[in-house]
Amino acid sequence: TLCALCGVPMPFDGESPALEPVLAPARAALGAEPVRRCLVFAPDALGDQFAAARPDLAAAVAAVAPLAVPLHSIDPPWTPVCFASMFTGASPARHGIRKYEKPVLAIDTVFDAFTRAGRRVAIVAVADSSLDRIFRGRALDYYSEKYDPWVTEKALSLVAADRHDLVIAYHQEYDDVMHALGPVHPRALRGARNHVEAFVDLAAAVESAWARH
């Protein structure tokens, strides 16, 4: 879907078609023009339980990003398995990550596809996280940060600089606390609130800094 929106050929190993419910409104808004700048905010583990427990936060996300397309999680739903599938378009059987492990992916990814198309990519993630590790060794810019607030700060600076076509920003506080205390524990939901607030700030920065695109 990301490749289709941006006019980039999909990864060689991709098995999943682009999501038409996402492409249709993009075509209606842009016609044949591709998306020229894209921010992907990737907070770990936010799903239906979060939305049910804090509908106010889900509404805050919808106010900024109103299009929602329900999807099933990859099985098994471990972070590296999910992100490997998301950014390759391939199943775990194809990309090779089937448990909680962080090898560098050997197959083609969205990031490879973007760089082949001459697009500049940045991944901003908490140091040693799955997203920080499994996509290494590619011709893109990696920023390994101390924790979520530093990720947000760096992502905001990259958006303002306007030199990257695709910026990925990964947060993990909700996932960290959820595994320790449960998905609807107040501390976990406080982490979710922090993710939503960061997303709102990043979306506002994108609207301002990338308006000419």
Predicted regions and their residues:
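Active-site-proximal alpha/beta segments of enzymes that process anionic O-linked groups
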Residues: 1-8, 13-27, 35-40, 47-162
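Structural motif
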Residues: 37-39, 166, 213
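DG-centered beta-turn motif at the end of beta-strands
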Residues: 43-46, 172
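Short secondary-structure transition/capping segments
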Residues: 114-126, 168-179, 212-213
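Secondary-structure boundary elements
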Residues: 115-120, 159-165, 201-212
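Active-site regions of oxyanion-processing enzymes, predominantly non-cytosolic
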Residues: 152-181
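A long, amphipathic alpha-helix that forms part
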Residues: 153, 175-213
